[in-house]
Amino acid sequence: MSTHIEAQQGDIAETVLLPGDPLRAKYIAETFLTDVHRYNTIRNAFGYTGYYKGQAISVQASGMGIPSISIYANELIQFYGVKRLIRVGTCGGLGTDVHVRDVMIAQSASTDSAIIQNTFGAGLYYAPTADFKLLMKAYQAAQQAQIAVKVGNILSEDRFYNDEIDRQKLIQYGVLGSEMEAAALYMLAAKFNVQALAVLTISNHIITGEETSAEEREKSFNEMITVALEAGIA
């Protein structure tokens, strides 16, 4: 048992999907997994373990933002021996070549968070990147399922409401979308020598204003979940 997760040793699989929303965690477990049991209710950050195609998979809600996902990633890795962490969540789209409901695989995650400087000190700008093997498995799974995906750099922001960032410059430099967690997940995975990936769905377009409903964000986006699950099994 850790500070924020009440599971016992052996309750959590080596592969964990990390949705931010606890209701999305519940939806994933009930819709995609078999023989499911819930191992965590602390702070209503629901955690479940079940089976997908015969292999144990866990789903742990991780909250919103870098501080929250950092807590769960640290505890899953250090207390429960998790080896593969796959964030599944939403992302705001940027540019004209990405659209609402597109699936996106984050190859790398730039950030405006101070987590990089706090870790490495001033003057060193570490580049958080996904695990290549997980990324390739996710991309190949999407191709086999005929799911169109975008692969590229995203931005992990510290603020959801942020008017100061130059969005057009991000688009110019090929940043596909914006969310709030992946950079920390990738950095922590590198620190502890485990695998991490973010598979995202564009829930809204930051430039055009198009968006999906809260219910759709909670209970759909099944293509993203399928890609993540396929990447997570051996």
Swiss-Prot record:
Catalyzes the reversible phosphorolytic breakdown of the N-glycosidic bond in the beta-(deoxy)ribonucleoside molecules, with the formation of the corresponding free purine bases and pentose-1-phosphate. This is Purine nucleoside phosphorylase DeoD-type. InterPro entries: DeoD-type (IPR004402), Nucleoside_phosphorylase_d (IPR000845), Nucleoside_phosphorylase_sf (IPR035994). The record marks 217 as: Important for catalytic activity. Homohexamer; trimer of homodimers. Keywords: Glycosyltransferase, Transferase. It comes from Latilactobacillus sakei subsp. sakei (strain 23K). CDD domains: PNP_EcPNPI-like (cd09006). It comes from the Bacteria.
